[in-house]
Amino acid sequence: MDAYEVTIGQFKKFLKSSGYKPDDAIDWNGVYEYSPTEKHPMIYVSWHGATAYAKWAGKRLPTEKEWEIAARGGWKNKEYSWGDNESLARDYANYDGTGGEDKWKYCAPVGSLKPNGYGLFDMAGNVYEWCQDWYGSRQKYRVLRGGSWFFNANSLRVANRNDNAPNVRFYHYGFRCVSGSN
């Protein structure tokens, strides 16, 4: 599992060298409004765009199971990637509920907060991360995990799940990659 979410800078290199064209043009003004530097996570990226990037990088999106194991950081039966104490969330996660006590209005640069027990950053908060899996048996929506800056601490729970259609892009959706086959 990559230690960091894919950044804007990394995604731009992919676009330039691969020639990949998303179905709809990327709204870079929107991207930079919420994620203002090349070191911030790439947002407004669909599951299709995330998958294309991963393939270009010789990687893939994590399965939901892989994502959850990695997010737990070695903990078992704990609510969050850092344990059970929600009051520590500000040290590990960028989310809506910091009471203005963090430095970021929206996304934080990747790796700005403490890593989990496996040395992985931003496994809780910052941006929801696309996973390989379908959400449910109807195969209409893809899984997103991890919570985001837009949601409260409840979204930071390791077991929290979200979903959306694979062509959807939002200002709080991003991704990270994993090496190897599933």
Label every model-predicted segment:
Residues 27-162, 166-171, 178:
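Functional-site microenvironments in short loops/helix caps that host divalent-cation chemistry
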Residues 1-28, 44-48, 125:
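A short glycine-rich, aromatic-capped structural motif
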